[in-house]
From Swiss-Prot:
InterPro entries: Enolpyruvate_Tfrase_dom (IPR001986), Enolpyruvate_Tfrase_sf (IPR036968), MurA_subfamily (IPR050068), RNA3'P_cycl/enolpyr_Trfase_a/b (IPR013792), UDP_GlcNAc_COvinyl_MurA (IPR005750)
Protein name: UDP-N-acetylglucosamine 1-carboxyvinyltransferase
Entry superkingdom: Bacteria
Cell compartment(s), UniProt: Cytoplasm
One of the protein's GO biological processes: peptidoglycan biosynthetic process
Taxonomic placement: Bacteria, Pseudomonadati, Pseudomonadota, Gammaproteobacteria, Lysobacterales
């Protein structure tokens, strides 16, 4: 099993290219099933979850080709949905990735039936699919859960437009309903919709392919269904969580970094907290520069919340920052009930963290000490790498398959910035 070895103590300097967003490309790949001709998606990151989704699409019968592209634009994937015949998404492929549930809406909407195994993925809390099911039922779907599968059908041949109010904000629930509504008969209204940039990116992709969508990025999305989407090309937005992770890494190590082709407007909450921590940040239309040369960060307080609040996917990275910051930082997790699993591993490195329910109180220390640690989920693995970058000695991070689900070549990108980091098999 692969491990990552980090030797701390080197500030990060230089430029880095941010990959396409994992949480945008997965629903967009699912959305290609709504088209009646090939669709090309560019700026696709090479991630374990992306490969899993490609395998799922192929299992359904879709033709999928991957083009390496050029460094500046990333890979492209062309999906030809015209050969889809299968309606069952098997557990063997679904078990490692929660986003597989996003195939439910497109399959049901286009083919009138779908069976999707209940999904797997990171073990960071209960993320039930009941909102997906109730949303699709509001469009006329008949759904049961049997033997570990969500079984859905449409008795009248085509989903009908309807109105649905989410009980709680759900990103993937919003995406599933949005895709299904795009080819439903009539107008659908989605209330209390997720406002994340990845939802907006999906909507913009659907519009590019011929969908009629208004209000994406607000709590109310209106979709006027069309019969089928068309062929087209779309570029995935840059990954805001990868962007934030590299910014935090640079702030922790006292370095300087420049990023091009990013979306600063999707990172307001993160950039605000980095400024509070003492970083000097310059923002352009599609660029970010952060300078923390020779300075120790200050602790920050934060509470995770749905967008545009502070993203839960950046909580672990900021906890790592608070571990070596000056002062005491308080972190409240409100999205997932089990997302402090990285704390025990940070404690092994010498961090001072006290957990009180859904709150972590972090007393910054001047230095951490390298030690063997174990990744427990995707973002926790990133936080351990960040901690290793500032720890004395070597930090060996085990179970990094979590990392490969969401970060493309993170050790190579950090190495270009000057980090002493390598993958060991």
């Amino acid at each position: 099993m692969s491990k990552i070895v980090v030797a701390g103590g080197t500030p990060l300097y230089g430029d880095v290219r941010i990959s396409g967003a994992k949480n945008a490309v997965l629903p967009i790949l699912c959305a290609t099933l709504l088209a009646d001709a090939p669709v090309e998606i560019s700026n696709v990151p090479y991630l374990h979850d992306v490969i899993t989704m490609i395998n799922l699409l192929r299992e359904l019968g879709a033709g999928v080709t991957m083009n390496e592209g050029i460094e500046a634009k990333g890979r492209s994937i062309t999906v030809d949905p015209r050969w889809v015949r299968q309606r069952v998404v098997p557990y063997d492929l679904v078990k490692t990735m929660r986003a597989s549930v996003l195939l439910l809406g497109p399959l049901l909407a286009c083919y009138g039936a779908a069976e999707v195994a209940l999904p797997g993925g990171c073990a960071i809390g209960s993320r039930p699919v009941d909102q997906h099911i109730r949303g699709l039922q509001s469009l006329g779907a008949e759904i049961t859960v049997e033997n570990g599968y969500i079984k859905a059908s449409v008795s009248q041949g085509r989903l009908k437009g309807g109105r649905f109010v989410f009980d709680v904000v759900s990103v993937t629930g919003t995406e599933n309903l949005l895709m299904a509504a795009a080819v439903a008969q009539g107008t659908s209204v989605i209330e209390n919709a997720a406002m994340e940039p990845e939802v907006v990116d999906l909507a913009e992709c659907l519009i590019t392919l011929g969908a009629r969508v208004e209000g994406a990025g607000t709590p109310r999305i209106v979709v006027e269904g069309v019969e089928r989407l068309k062929s087209g090309q779309y570029a995935v937005l840059p990954d805001r969580i990868e962007t934030g992770t590299f910014l935090v890494a640079t702030a922790m190590t006292g370095g300087r970094i420049s990023m091009q082709q990013v979306r600063p407007q999707t990172l307001d909450a993160v950039l605000g907290k980095l400024t509070e921590a003492g970083a000097c940040i310059e923002i352009g239309a599609d660029s970010i520069r952060l300078d923390m040369q020779g300075r120790r960060p200050c602790s920050v307080n934060l509470t995770t919340a749905p967008y545009p609040g502070f993203p839960t996917d950046m909580q672990a990275q900021f906890m790592a920052l608070n571990c070596v910051a000056e002062g005491v930082g308080v972190i409240k997790e409100t999205i997932f009930e089990n997302r402090f699993m990285h704390v025990d591993e940070l404690l092994r490195l010498g961090a001072k963290i006290q957990i009180e329910g859904h709150t972590a109180i972090v007393q910054g220390v001047e230095r951490l000490s390298g030690a063997p640690v174990m990744a427990t989920d995707l973002r926790a693995s990133a936080s351990l790498i960040l901690a290793g970058l500032v720890a004395e000695g070597e930090t060996i991070i085990d179970r990094i398959y979590h990392l490969d689900r969401g970060y493309e070549n993170i050790e190579k990108k950090l190495g270009v910035l000057g980090a002493s980091i390598r993958r060991m098999t």
